[in-house]
Structures are given as C-alpha cells and as structure tokens.
Amino acid sequence: MSRASLSMAVILLLIAGHAHAQGKAGKGIRLWNLTTSTITGVQLSPAGKQQWSANLTLADKDKEVDHDERLRITGIEPGSYDAKVSYSEARQCVVRNIEIKADAVFSIADKDLQDCNK
C-alpha cells in the first residue's frame, strides 16, 4: 500500500469514528406538552427551592409549545425539579417534583398542574 493510500485510509477511519461518536450523542432533555393548551412559558427550579430559570420556551422557534409538541431543554442537569407553567390567557400553574433524566422526555399534562392562579 502506498503512503498516500495509507494516509487516505487513516483519514477515512478518523472521519468514520467521529461520525459514529456524534451518532451516539443523546437527544438531550425534552419537555412534552400533554396539556390541552399551548404553553407560553416554562421555568424550572430545583424542587422546593423557588429559584426559577429563565423562560425556556424562548428557545423554541415560535416561542411557545403547542399541545403534543416537544421542547428541547438546555442548561438543566438531571434531577428533581418544580416547573412554573404559563399560558397565553395569563394563567400560571406549578408542577412539583418532576424527575428529569438525561437524554429523556418528561411530560406535563393537565392532571399535573397545581396552584393555578385562574
């Protein structure tokens, strides 16, 4: 095998290995909106702490999460969280003790909503 052929083979192996490693990367944490309304705001706090994150729906292309839509969540580590959920009609509710796992989907449904202000 010539030196050029050997170099090309090594490069192809490196590229294939990199592509394989990227394919193994997880899908990240996602919120699945199973409520009957469009969510316009989601803030997370470590369970019981009342230290709310920024509005996570702002990362969505239309800045809201429709029924049955999933939203990729970034900047949050796996753990137990409370969620503050807001709707366009000014209603805001809390969901307590959501277990968020790495590379997994967590859902919020109407039955999970507590302490709604309307």
Give residue spans per PLM region.
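Asparagine-centered strand-capping/turn motif at beta-strand->loop junctions
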Residues: 29-36, 46
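Intrinsically disordered, low-complexity Pro/Gly/Ser/Thr-rich segments with frequent PxxP/GP/PP motifs
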Residues: 50-78
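Structural beta-strand segments of beta-rich domains
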Residues: 25-29, 69
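Structured interaction patches on ligand/partner-binding surfaces of diverse proteins
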Residues: 22-23, 86-117
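Short acidic/proline- and small/hydrophobic-mixed sequence motifs that coincide with surface turns
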Residues: 37-41
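Bacterial N-terminal signal peptides that target proteins for export
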Residues: 1-8
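Sec/Tat signal peptide C-region and signal peptidase I cleavage site
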Residues: 17-21
